[in-house]
From Swiss-Prot:
Biased composition (Low complexity): 347-359, 370-388, 570-581, 591-610, 666-676
Superkingdom of origin organism: Viruses
Feature: compositional bias, Pro residues: 515-539, 550-569, 611-620
Biased composition range(s): Basic and acidic residues: 405-480
Name of protein: Uncharacterized protein DR1
Region (Disordered): 347-689
UniProt miscellaneous comment: DR1 gene is not required for propagation in cell culture. Loss of a part of the DR region may occur in viruses propagated on cell cultures.
Encoding gene (name): DR1L
Length: 689
């Protein structure tokens, strides 16, 4: 007589489950059917997953006929047992089948059970229907059938498919539903081991970040749907180097405050109101989602962007920095930048003038508004920069340094060559702040001594203002076009600006929010992505050169002259005996706008023509000063560009003139006749005459 499991013996069901499966597999199908009638409704735990059970029933299809969503689709009823029969016909699914199958019972996936009501009017099921399993995305009903030789089959009712599970019950006791094709068919869990999916309790700390990272690949919409289900959950973020250093991420919606198991969430609605303008500029409006904060530092929030990178924001001082390329990389490797910085004070030390209420803030703000060269500290790599914040007047500032409305290329030019400009001030008679600070110096003189000038000087300044706007607008347009083409001028120079300027360049490099090219190291975010600023309006440029009113020139400021070329050394002259001529003086900005760059690809500075902006009306035969070329990748060479409507800057030299020497990466060790001319360009014969 078969063993009957009564209600009082519920703790013994799991050990006896193997007996029931072996009992079903080692008897004829006629005896198995008698056992099903005797133990109708008994739940036998599956070998895997243990959370699911087989509901023994002699006629499981009779229970499914009451759902209109199945009966209205005749193709789903193929092979079903008739009212007077018990057997399932597999020929509509496998034409080579020679025997019928006996239904053993029904498996209802735990999250669904029987949620589809009898009044359902759906004609078909889709992966987004709420009746489908939230674990697998497949049908919530699976019917287990047994063949003549003991093989087990699985019938996916709502999909109308038949799969083989195993060729014997003994093999099924080892694998369970691991090889059930109806479950493996779901695309969301194709690359995830299935045992971790069957969790009826709260997701564990290791499984939840994996689930979130997989959904983040499909964008913010897929991540948001799963993130809303697990608000208040905690997951551990381990340190990639120090195993004992770890912190917890608390999934929280900052807009809902402390409701729904979010008691540890800080009230940060007013803080995010300050961060919103900065995040909208960096990621775009609607392209970022704050999803968690750190349990050890509740003021640090993690933000997922539309492109995939993960940002961290400190809501106290409104500083933003990038911590990982995507959420899965953050889960696997942790974040050295995030976790190692938790021991340090994230807020600046007292006395640094960071807080808006501290003394010296207004004076610092006025100083940053008056000086147009103050962005040097924001892009310089000589020391750590200060965190970014949004000032009370709505401007984005890096520490106490306010970003001016000039294009990014001019700001980074000042940052690259702050030392060079200060050393050349004695040649130009400047005030010691560089030639680009003449505008600020001029404005200061306008405020202090307007009576010393005359009406003629004011009219002169008004006329030159229009030319300045036209020049700056053209420079800004050209710099944006060069930046969007993927130039690596600023990324190779070591002055790349971090998001919010947090940390040094070697510890937190600037990587764009969305990497468009195959090599992200050669791409620099355009200025409108970092901190966009309105450009001055376009005005027509006259043919006459623009006159920039300046302070009275000093005695050392003289117009540039064409210096004669030093004689070429002979072959027997040693390299050390040849004195290299110094670089000619830089012309004042009133003659032509000059762009300075420091080349890092060669040991000796190489000279090549660079475009002027705007094109000056100087004739082609007049001498031009050599320019240091912009920084480019090692495999690229800059070509001299010519403005449309103007002749070439360097006309072709006659055949008698020597050819230009190519630019090399290092000075040759042996003394050669052209060793002293490495990197020099031979001027045309018309110039030397």
């Amino acid at each position: 007589m078969p063993l009957t499991v009564r209600a009082g013996h519920a703790p013994y069901r799991l050990p006896l489950s193997n007996y029931w499966w072996l009992l079903l597999g080692r008897h004829s199908l006629r005896h198995v059917h008698s056992y099903l009638r005797l133990h109708k409704g008994l739940r036998i735990p599956l070998p895997w997953p243990e959370q699911e059970c087989l509901h023994l029933h002699p006629k499981p299809y009779k229970c499914l006929l009451r759902y209109p969503c199945i009966t209205r689709q005749p193709h789903l009823l193929q092979g079903w047992p008739t009212k007077s029969s018990l057997w399932f016909d597999p020929k509509p699914y496998h034409p080579s089948a020679d025997s019928k199958l006996l239904p053993l019972g029904l498996i209802t996936l735990s999250a669904c059970s029987t949620r589809v009501s009898a009044t359902t009017r759906w004609s078909s099921f889709h992966a987004t229907d709420p009746s489908l399993s939230w674990l697998t995305g497949s049908s919530p009903w699976l019917v287990i059938l047994q063949g003549q030789g003991g093989s087990l089959f699985c019938h996916d009712v709502l999909q109308g498919r038949l799969y083989i599970l195993s060729h014997s019950v003994s093999l099924f006791l080892k694998t369970g539903l691991r090889h059930c094709e109806a479950i493996y068919r779901a695309p969301l869990w194709r690359d995830r081991p299935l045992p971790s999916l069957w969790t009826c309790r709260d997701p564990d700390k290791a499984f939840l970040p994996t689930l979130l990272a997989r959904s983040a690949r499909r964008g913010l919409a897929a991540f948001y749907a799963l993130w809303r289900l697990h608000l208040g959950s905690r997951s551990e973020l381990s340190h990639p180097v120090l195993e004992w250093e770890s912190t917890e991420l608390v999934l929280t919606d900052w807009r809902r405050g402390r409701n729904e198991a979010q008691r540890d969430a800080p009230s940060v609605a007013e803080h995010f109101a300050r961060c919103r303008p900065l995040l909208d500029e960096l990621c775009g409006e609607g392209g970022w989602l704050p999803f968690a904060f750190l349990s050890t530092s509740p003021h640090v929030w993690l933000i997922l962007t539309e492109g995939g990178p993960v940002l961290a924001v400190d809501v106290n001082d409104t500083s933003v920095w990038r911590i990982a390329d995507d959420l899965e990389l953050l889960r696997r490797l942790g974040s050295l930048l995030l976790l190692s910085g938790l021991r340090l004070p994230l807020r600046p030390p007292s006395g640094s003038g960071e807080a808006a209420g501290e003394p010296g803030y207004e004076e610092e703000e006025r100083r940053g508004r008056a000086s147009t060269a103050s962005a040097t500290a924001a892009t310089s790599t000589r020391g750590p920069t200060r965190p970014t914040r949004v000032t009370r007047k709505g401007r984005v500032a890096t520490g106490g340094v306010h970003l001016s409305a000039r294009p990014e290329s001019e700001e980074q030019t000042d940052g690259h060559h702050g030392r060079q400009e200060s050393s050349d001030d004695h040649q130009r008679g400047g005030s010691g702040r560089g030639h680009r600070d003449d505008g600020a110096h001029r404005h200061a003189n306008d405020k202090t001594e307007p009576q010393q000038r005359g009406e003629h000087e004011e009219r002169k300044q008004t006329d030159s203002g229009r030319h300045e706007h036209a020049q700056e607008s053209q420079v800004a347009r050209r710099d944006e076009e060069e930046t969007e083409q993927g130039d690596s001028e600023r990324s190779c120079g070591g002055a790349t600006q971090t998001y919010g300027g947090r940390g040094r360049h070697d510890s937190c490099p600037s990587i764009p929010l969305s990497v468009p090219g195959p090599d992200p190291r050669l791409w620099v975010p355009p200025p409108h992505l970092l901190f966009p600023s309105p450009l001055p309006p376009m005005t027509p440029v006259d043919d006459e050169p623009s006159v920039r009113p300046r302070c009275p020139p000093g005695p050392a400021e003289e117009p540039p002259t064409c210096r004669p070329r030093p004689p070429r050394p002979s072959s027997d002259t040693p390299l050390s005996a040849v004195s290299r001529p110094s670089a000619p003086p830089v012309p004042p900005p009133s003659t032509a706008r000059v762009r300075f760059f420091l080349s890092s690809s060669s040991s000796s500075p190489s000279y090549s023509p660079a475009p002027l902006s705007p094109p000056s009306p100087v004739s082609p035969s007049s001498p031009r000063s050599p320019f240091i070329p912009p920084i480019r990748s090692p495999g690229l060479r800059a070509k001299p560009r010519v403005s449309s409507g103007h002749p070439a800057a360097f006309p072709p030299a006659p055949s008698s003139a020597p050819a230009r020497s190519e630019r090399v990466t290092s000075v040759p060790s042996s003394a050669s006749p052209s060793a002293s001319c490495v990197g020099k360009s031979q001027p045309p014969a018309a110039h030397t005459a």
